[in-house]
């Protein structure tokens, strides 16, 4: 791993932009042609970040206006890769049976694997989460 590349700092900047609902700031940290995959959408759900995952990033703050992001743990790996445990959420717009009631504030655990190129730009972002809660939020936004 390059000593000059601080992937932890770049990752913190990415999640700070997400917390601030600054999708343009998030995209600025992604390489051209960067790919992402949100695994609960299926193992073959890889898509471009620009025009793909970007839509999801823009959508959650609309469904959950006080949407926020908190990094719980950040682990630097090999080859400019980072694993992140984060809590994402806010005031729930719908009941999530057994998890949270409509109007309550909750954050849903997410796990990210983020890979960077030598220039410090995200080239790949994979994410895992509890899909039951997310499905309820998506349904409420329709």
Annotate each PLM feature:
Residues 1-142:
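C-terminal and inter-domain tail/linker signature
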């Amino acid at each position: 791993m390059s000593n000059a590349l601080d992937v932890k700092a770049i990752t913190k900047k990415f999640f700070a932009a997400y917390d601030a609902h600054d999708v343009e700031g998030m995209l600025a940290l992604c390489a051209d042609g960067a790919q992402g995959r949100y695994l609960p959408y299926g193992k073959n759900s890889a898509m471009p970040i620009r025009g793909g995952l970007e839509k999801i990033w823009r959508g959650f703050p609309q469904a959950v206006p006080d949407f926020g992001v908190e990094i719980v743990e950040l682990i630097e790996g090999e080859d400019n890769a980072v694993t992140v445990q984060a809590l994402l959420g806010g005031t729930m717009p719908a009941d999530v049976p057994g998890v949270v009631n409509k109007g309550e504030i909750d954050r849903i655990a997410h796990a990210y694997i983020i890979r960077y190129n030598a220039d410090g730009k995200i080239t790949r972002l994979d994410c895992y989460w509890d899909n039951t809660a997310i499905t309820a939020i998506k349904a409420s936004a329709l």
